[in-house]
């Protein structure tokens, strides 16, 4: 590029004005919505020495003068010091003046360096802008050539501007005018200022964004700025930021319109899922899923819930694979832990003592344990299931004692399911009884070998042979009768042949070859559970596999907990419980149900999750039983028939869960088609204030079985009029509830025939009405009895006698063959020859 004004450059010169020492510039500011504002700025230029200029250094003077530093606000005029005056100065003053001169030179040098650095930076910026302007002009020229080529090949588009002047020509004309004016202004300036100003103005005026004409295939260029989009005067308004953003998004969308490759995913499907959730797991739009369902004639919304089958069809249709899971999967792996065959060791046998009530099961176990359990049971009958462990010849045997009463059927069935050997106790003087037969059936259903113990052999009326013969009728063949079932004649009272019974048990256990892996995680079954005051939930469990340790986390039914204590059958605290060991555990969050299986889990989170799932499942089942929205016709008819059934509401609190279960089963059998029992609430533990409140709202009777209410609860019950009944024998409880329910039965009407009378004549009596003159043909007539009017052997009226007179006197009774006058209540259609039947109705109380 030439520094002469007449030389041509790649772009036309800009219009400039001569810069004076003080000049006024107008800066035009552009705002949104086409608003502008002009600001007048006055600047003063100072002469700055450029690096390429030759600066004449001042001649050194022989006599120094003091120049004040520029940083001081007060500048004094330098005074020329004559040699005479200098000679009058002291050495201190001369040193001060020399230091001031040196500081002034240092300050000037610093200012000169800063100005040089600033000038270099400005020159580099100007060169960069000039380079960018050259590139812009080159792009503009290329753009113009493309437009000319496209116009020659295609039809000419409708011009956006006036037909007389094209945008390119207007730009060139404006540039020509600006360069002409600039050449006149720059003629009076020196060459250095002209070179500097021309570069600065060139970078501002000629760096313009080329206008884009629609329909061209121009590629994207660099990012535009507002300054480069506007000229120096601001005549044209550039694109807004929103417009530029829209343009970029449109370009991106155009690039992304290429078809993407379908990604197949593995979709995990639970039992139920919403359409929105399914679409998110497939990474599809929920609208597309809705459209697919509409094609299948299923009108649904994104929030609708569908089952796993429909969700699987949708996922397969969209090209994904499916993995179905269930909420019950969380329970997998807690019970089906494989045993290591190399670690299997012999375990003690689990023996269940079964039989009829009062046949001596607990007494036999007492004799074996050398303890007195019967005395602790109310009424002398076993009402709890107990587990004990005894030792015979160095080998342990675990005994489970089950109740023999008819109400404890579920307990006997549970005892047979968890046992290895069943000892059937039959009294020699009583032979086979109903619960004996039931125990045999439970043992056979559980495929458990039976050992028959013929008890009470010491009694004079004992007949062991009769017992063996009656057992044959129920397919129990003892060894003495040619069978395979072991039998032992014992006496729990005298202890006769108890050692033979234990040896028979150990022999049967050896035949069964009972083994277990004691090193795996423990699991087993809950034999009994109760809520103990001061200790919380206490569960009696039987470890079947593995070893149960203190602080283990277990899940039992709907409850979970961390074991805080392990107590054996003797009341001793232990740290571990091996297989076939019955123990009491403390630390459960709630009271589990008797018969629930328990297992040890790894951590609390999993135990809590399993328990919550089981509780939710139990609630859903209860709600389904209660609501029953989809009932069959038979269920609807039964419900209509039971609308008028009276209910006897009960709240049952017991010491252990098994007793409550037995009481509930016994009470459910008491109802008939008119009255039924309704168990509002049942649970193990003492009677609380919440039980009284529930009894008040449900109009129930509170029953405590081996539990009591404290003084606060008793006072609350007395205030609210709630009856609390205490029992410790299940016989008495069932009998009292049966008598109370009998009181709810409507009395039975019994009709007694008294006699017949024939109407001879009808009389009309003032203030009384029609009176029939009758003769008693059979039996007698009593005053206030019921009557039926029979005409031609058809009963046309049934009612009561209003009056009974004989010779104008009121009488209470008229015997056969006598005549009397009879009037009916609210009925007068009587004729001669009709027959009157007299009867008496009696109300008799009914019982269940």
Curated annotation (Swiss-Prot):
Annotated region G1: the residues are: 355-362
Residue ranges of region G3? 401-404
Q: Where is this region: G4?
A: 455-458
This entry's Gene Ontology molecular function terms read:
GTP binding; GTPase activity; guanosine tetraphosphate binding; translation initiation factor activity
Chain positions recorded as GTP binding sites = 355-362, 401-405, 455-458
Provide ranges: composition bias, Basic and acidic residues. 1-10, 121-138
In residue numbers, the region (Disordered) covers 1-79, 121-163
Q: Where does the record place the region G2?
A: 380-384
Which UniProt keywords are present, listed alphabetically? Cytoplasm, GTP-binding, Initiation factor, Nucleotide-binding, Protein biosynthesis
Gene3D superfamilies in UniProt: P-loop containing nucleotide triphosphate hydrolases, Translation factors, Translation initiation factor IF- 2, domain 3
Q: Which residues form the tr-type G domain?
A: 346-513
- What is the superkingdom listed in this entry's lineage? Bacteria
Q: What does this protein do?
A: One of the essential components for the initiation of protein synthesis. Protects formylmethionyl-tRNA from spontaneous hydrolysis and promotes its binding to the 30S ribosomal subunits. Also involved in the hydrolysis of GTP during the formation of the 70S ribosomal complex.
The record, for NCBIfam families, names:
IF-2 (TIGR00487), small_GTP (TIGR00231)
Please give the family membership noted in the entry. Answer: Belongs to the TRAFAC class translation factor GTPase superfamily. Classic translation factor GTPase family. IF-2 subfamily.
- Record-linked PANTHER family: TR-TYPE G DOMAIN-CONTAINING PROTEIN (PTHR43381:SF5), TRANSLATION INITIATION FACTOR IF-2-RELATED (PTHR43381)
Q: What is this protein called?
A: Translation initiation factor IF-2
**What species is this protein from?**
Bartonella bacilliformis (strain ATCC 35685 / KC583 / Herrer 020/F12,63)
Task: Please state the gene responsible for encoding this protein.
Answer: infB
């Amino acid at each position: 590029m030439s520094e002469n004004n007449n030389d041509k450059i790649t772009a036309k010169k800009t219009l400039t004005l001569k810069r004076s020492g003080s000049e006024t510039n107008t800066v035009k500011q552009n705002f949104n919505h086409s608003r502008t504002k002009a600001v007048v700025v006055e600047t003063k230029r100072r002469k700055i020495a450029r690096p390429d200029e030759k600066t004449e250094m001042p001649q050194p003077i022989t006599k120094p003068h003091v120049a004040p530093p520029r940083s001081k606000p007060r500048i004094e005029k330098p005074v020329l010091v004559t040699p005479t005056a200098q000679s009058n100065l002291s050495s201190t003053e001369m040193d001060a003046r020399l230091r001031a001169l040196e500081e002034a030179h240092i300050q000037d040098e610093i200012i000169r360096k800063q100005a040089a650095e600033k000038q270099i930076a400005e020159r580099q910026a100007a060169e960069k802008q000039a380079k960018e302007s050259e590139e812009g002009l080159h792009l503009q020229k290329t753009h113009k050539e493309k437009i000319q080529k496209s116009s020659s090949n295609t039809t000419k588009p409708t011009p956006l501007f006036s037909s007389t002047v094209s945008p390119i020509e207007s730009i060139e004309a404006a540039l020509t005018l600006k360069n002409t004016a600039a050449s006149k202004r720059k003629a009076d300036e020196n060459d250095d200022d002209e070179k500097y100003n021309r570069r600065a103005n060139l970078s501002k005026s000629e760096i313009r964004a080329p206008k884009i004409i629609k329909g061209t295939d121009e590629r994207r260029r660099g990012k535009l700025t507002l300054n480069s989009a506007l000229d120096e005067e601001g005549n044209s308004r550039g694109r807004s930021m929103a417009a530029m953003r829209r343009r970029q998004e449109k370009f991106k969308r155009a690039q992304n319109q290429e078809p993407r490759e379908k990604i197949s995913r593995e979709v995990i499907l639970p039992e139920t899922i919403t359409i929105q959730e399914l679409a998110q797991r497939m990474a599809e739009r929920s609208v597309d899923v809705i459209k697919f369902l509409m094609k299948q004639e299923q009108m649904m919304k994104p929030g609708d819930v569908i089952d796993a089958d429909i969700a699987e069809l949708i996922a397969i249709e969209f090209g994904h694979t499916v993995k179905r899971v269930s909420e019950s999967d969380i329970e997998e792996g807690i019970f089906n832990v494989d045993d290591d065959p190399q670690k299997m060791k012999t375990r003690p046998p689990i023996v269940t003592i079964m039989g009829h009530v009062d046949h001596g099961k607990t007494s036999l176990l007492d004799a074996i344990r050398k303890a007195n359990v019967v005395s602790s049971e109310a009424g002398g009958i076993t009402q709890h299931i107990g587990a004990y462990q005894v030792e015979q010849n160095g080998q342990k045997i675990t005994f489970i004692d089950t109740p023999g009463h008819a109400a404890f059927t579920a307990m006997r069935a549970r005892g047979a399911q968890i046992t290895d050997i069943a000892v059937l106790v039959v009294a020699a003087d009583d032979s086979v009884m109903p619960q004996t037969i039931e125990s045999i059936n439970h043992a056979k259903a559980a495929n458990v070998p039976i050992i028959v113990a013929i008890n009470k052999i010491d009694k004079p009326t004992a007949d062991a042979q009769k017992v063996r013969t009656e057992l044959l009728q129920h397919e129990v063949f003892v060894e003495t009768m040619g069978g395979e079932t072991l039998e032992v004649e014992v006496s729990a009272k005298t202890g006769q042949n108890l050692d033979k019974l234990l040896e028979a048990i150990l022999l049967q256990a050896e035949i069964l070859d009972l083994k277990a892996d004691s090193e795996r995680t423990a699991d087993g079954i809950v034999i009994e559970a109760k809520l103990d005051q001061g200790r919380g939930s206490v569960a009696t469990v039987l470890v079947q596999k593995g070893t149960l340790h203190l602080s283990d986390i277990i899940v039992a039914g709907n409850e979970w907990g961390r074991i805080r204590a392990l107590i054996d059958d003797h009341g001793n605290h232990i740290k571990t419980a091996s297989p076939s060991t019955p123990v009491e555990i403390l630390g459960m969050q709630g009271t589990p149900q008797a018969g629930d299986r328990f297992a040890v889990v790894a951590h609390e989170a999993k135990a809590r999750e399993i328990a919550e799932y089981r509780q939710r499942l139990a609630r859903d089942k209860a709600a389904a039983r209660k609501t029953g929205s989809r009932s069959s016709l038979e269920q609807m008819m039964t419900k209509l028939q039971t609308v008028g059934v009276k209910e006897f509401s009960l709240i049952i609190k017991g010491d252990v869960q098994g007793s409550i279960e037995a009481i509930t089963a016994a009470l459910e059998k008491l109802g008939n088609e008119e009255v039924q029992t309704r168990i509002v609430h049942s649970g193990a533990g003492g009677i609380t204030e919440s039980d009284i409140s529930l009894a008040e709202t449900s109009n129930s009777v509170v029953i405590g079985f081996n539990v009591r209410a404290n003084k606060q609860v008793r006072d609350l019950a007395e205030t609210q009029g709630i009856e609390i009944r205490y029992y410790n024998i299940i016989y008495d409880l069932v009998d009292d509830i049966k008598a109370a329910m009998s009181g709810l039965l409507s009395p039975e009407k019994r009709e007694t025939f008294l006699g017949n009378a024939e109407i001879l004549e009808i009389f009309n009596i003032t203030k009384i009405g029609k009176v029939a003159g009758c003769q008693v043909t059979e039996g007698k007539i009593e005053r206030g009895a019921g009557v039926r009017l029979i005409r031609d052997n058809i009963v046309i009226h049934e009612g009561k006698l209003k009056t009974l007179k004989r010779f104008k006197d009121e009488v209470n009774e008229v015997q056969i063959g006598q005549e009397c006058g009879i009037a009916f209540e609210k009925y007068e259609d009587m004729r001669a020859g009709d027959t009157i039947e007299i009867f008496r109705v009696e109300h008799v109380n009914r019982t269940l």
